[in-house]
Amino acid sequence: MSKKIETSAITAGRPAVTPDAPLNPSIDLTSTFHSGGPIGYGRYGNQTWTSLEDAISELEGGQTLTFSSGMAAISAVFSILPIGAPIVASNQGYSGVMSLLNSFHTSGRLEVRFVDVVNTQEVIDAMKGAALVWLESPTNPCLDVADLPALISAAKKLGIGVAVDNTFATPLVQNPLAMGADIVMHSVTKFLSGHSDVLMGSLSISDPALFKRLHDSRSFNGSIPGPFEAWLALRGLRTFPLRFNKSQESAKEL
């Protein structure tokens, strides 16, 4: 029997069940590890991050990497694209992303084709020759909703990668990886962590080779989360379904 997402939020990312084992993961405040293991150094991994990453993976699917912020996660995706690569992106969305994409477009780092994500055909028409389709749905703050299944399907037929910012919808509402997306991004700062005391981002990735490239990007750029922040985010994740459902009820009432 598959677990409900509410159950996964409570149970995922916990230590193995053995006699007298702690229920919660430890906060591993270390920069250095003994040799011979898979981590090697504090910029490459940390057991506290791993617990949070395992939990997000159980909600979103794929393999997950956590980052020092949502913008760090987004920047990692763009960092693996060639200079001048064409991408398709919404003409309105999170202000940090819009500023970054406009900067990339002006400098020639990327060729950004800005589109209205509500206009499905406009987005599809802009895809030809693109290296990536970056989708935010619902958008922040205007709440524009893209037809993700149609857009992801169209991109896949053209062999184009798709990344979806799932921060506002969350895995309680939609699972873009299950629709065929390659990457799902979260500003963990917002709904997943939910207590306004953590800056963090995450990427959930469907392909192991792509996961490795993004893992290397994080390691080399140093855009890693702190172990205490990862522990706080995991604690916040335990109540995520309750908080999200209550916020929807409040929004309907208002």
Label each residue range with its predicted role.
Residues 5-9, 55-58, 180-182, 186:
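Short, hydrophobic/aliphatic alpha-helical segments
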Residues 1-28:
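Short conserved active-site loop signatures built around small residues
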Residues 17, 34-37, 210-211:
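Short, acidic Gly/Pro/Ser/Thr-rich loop/turn segments
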Residues 25-80, 96-105:
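Conserved N-terminal alpha-helix of the aminotransferase class I/II PLP-enzyme fold
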Residues 12, 31, 117:
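Active-site donor-binding loop signature of nucleotide-sugar glycosyltransferases
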Residues 15, 64-254:
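Conserved PLP-enzyme active-site core in the AAT-like
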Residues 10, 41, 192:
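Short clusters of hydrophobic/aromatic residues that line enzyme substrate/ligand-binding pockets
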